[in-house]
Amino acid sequence: MVIKIHDLRPAPGSKRDKIRVGRGEGSKGKTAGRGTKGTKARKNVSPRFEGGQMPIHMRLPKLRGFKNRFRTEFHGVNVGKLAAAFPQGGTVGIDELISAGLANKGELVKILGDGDLEGVKLEVTAHAFTGSAQEKITAAGGSVTKLDR
């Protein structure tokens, strides 16, 4: 025998009829099983209501300060990483940093002073430099050139 989709029926007793409440004066009529009056008899309780406990939105601190929409964000590259990526020395610009994987295209690059140059002479061109990075590059015999933002 082939079973067809229109022959399928749920097992007897597995489905119950939906109870329609609040229709007429029967057992589920009028107050619809909710008792009389009070908050629980009304439509619903606000989802943020925590039963009289101080709610989470009042327990948490307020947001302070503001976010500057006009801030300039730099991608930092440390001097130690420059020495590792360019051990032979030479000219290091934004394009060289991108090809070495130290910066992404379109980012403003700032050279930071963490690490050692270990005598590597670099001519570095970037958008910004920290004081310590500038000192380390010039002390190793290199030069620093700032780009316009």
UniProtKB/Swiss-Prot annotation:
Disulfide bonds: none annotated. It holds the Pfam family Ribosomal_L27A. NCBIfam families: rplO_bact. PANTHER family: 50S RIBOSOMAL PROTEIN L15, LARGE RIBOSOMAL SUBUNIT PROTEIN UL15M. Residues 1-54 are annotated as: Disordered. This is Large ribosomal subunit protein uL15. InterPro entries: Ribosomal_uL15 (IPR030878), Ribosomal_uL15/eL18 (IPR021131), Ribosomal_uL15/eL18_sf (IPR036227), Ribosomal_uL15_bac-type (IPR005749), Ribosomal_uL15_CS (IPR001196). Binds to the 23S rRNA. One of its GO terms (cellular component) is cytosolic large ribosomal subunit.
